[in-house]
Amino acid sequence: MSARRRYPKISLPVDGLVTAAVLVPIFQKNGALHVLLTKRSDMVEHHRGEISFPGGKLDLTDPDLKSCALRETLEEVGILPADVKVLAELDDFYTVATRFHVVPFVGLIPHPYEYHVSPREIAGIVDPPLDIFFDPSKSREDTWIFRGEPVKMTSYLWEGHNIWGATARILKHLVELIESKEHENELND
């Protein structure tokens, strides 16, 4: 995946939504790619106990959304911005219930890394191999009724952790991009 966009980015209207940015941190461990996720603490305002990417609300001091994602990652798990190689900005997403407009950035981080987790925000770190998100047997799709409307929800189960909501949608989108890039490479060979 390169920083150059080979597909049109989908941006969402932000009216009435809180703008936030997240980092999708990818690292190599034991010869396989992994993604760093966090388990939110019970002390945060939104998404308590859920599995998410490091990230948060755009701050007035943030020059841009990428800086927001890197700042929040530093605050939550202690990864220095200089240690992240940002590869791409993905499509915008939103959270259904809490009304966040989320802009994800994919970045490579070194491994091993000495994380400094903020206990007020983060209860723990989860680092599933990226491969599980390519395996249809590891995912399920449910239809939830939200405000009287059906909403499709993809979720992944890994080592007892339920990865769902915007986090699962972002991971599913990342997998689709990687698969389409691999398919494009096969066609060009």
Where are these regions (language model features)?
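NUDIX/MutT-family hydrolases
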Residues: 117-159
